[in-house]
């Protein structure tokens, strides 16, 4: 464009994390950042679109193997105000690479003494928040002996991931993924943005 543009709304969404196999946690959603009233320069703006975390597979009950993978960051490179959304956290598997569970939204956990909770969301922290934490695995782990673990759901832009629920040594439900976030159409800036005839819903 010729000259700067003011009052722009910019949505930046990062790549989501991948889930872990064999009862592991679900991957977290990529960071979600919607900023209104941005001023854009009259020049090309570099944009990086983050990829989702690579999928994984592996044999059952193999300690130390195959956690999920984090998603990659997305960047809107406005020189006046660069906006980065963090990749989603990986689903964890047997407590391996627990820090990879943190991200834009956190990955769900697979029970392990060092990772009882899902990964943190809004990591690194920004305001407004770019995501939510992942859900927990079933709290009792592999108790009684012979039972199995079930992963928590990955966090979403609009809600935390659900916790898993083990109802018997051989039955249960994994945690649901967290909800996404609605996006409204806004034109102009506060205090009186124009939402259009549908009140910003489409």
Provide a role label for each language-model segment.
Residues 1-202:
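Glycine-biased low-complexity/repetitive sequence motifs
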């Amino acid at each position: 464009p010729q000259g700067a543009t003011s009052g722009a709304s910019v949505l930046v969404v990062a790549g989501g994390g991948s889930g872990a196999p064999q009862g592991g946690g679900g991957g977290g959603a990529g960071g979600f950042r919607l900023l209104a009233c941005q001023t854009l320069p009259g020049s090309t703006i570099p944009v990086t679109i983050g990829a989702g975390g690579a999928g994984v597979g592996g044999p059952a009950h193999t300690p130390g193997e195959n956690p999920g993978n984090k998603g990659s960051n997305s960047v809107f490179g406005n020189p006046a105000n660069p906006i980065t959304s963090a990749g989603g956290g990986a689903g964890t598997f047997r407590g391996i690479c627990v820090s990879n569970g943190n991200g834009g939204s956190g990955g769900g956990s697979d029970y392990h003494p060092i990772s009882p909770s899902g990964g943190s969301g809004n990591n690194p922290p920004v305001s407004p928040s770019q995501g939510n934490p992942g859900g927990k695995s079933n709290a009792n782990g592999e108790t009684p002996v012979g039972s199995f673990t079930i992963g928590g759901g990955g966090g979403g832009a609009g809600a935390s991931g659900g916790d898993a629920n083990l109802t018997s040594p051989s039955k249960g439900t994994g945690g649901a993924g967290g909800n996404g976030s609605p996006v409204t159409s806004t034109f102009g800036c506060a205090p009186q943005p124009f939402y259009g005839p549908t009140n910003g819903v489409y």
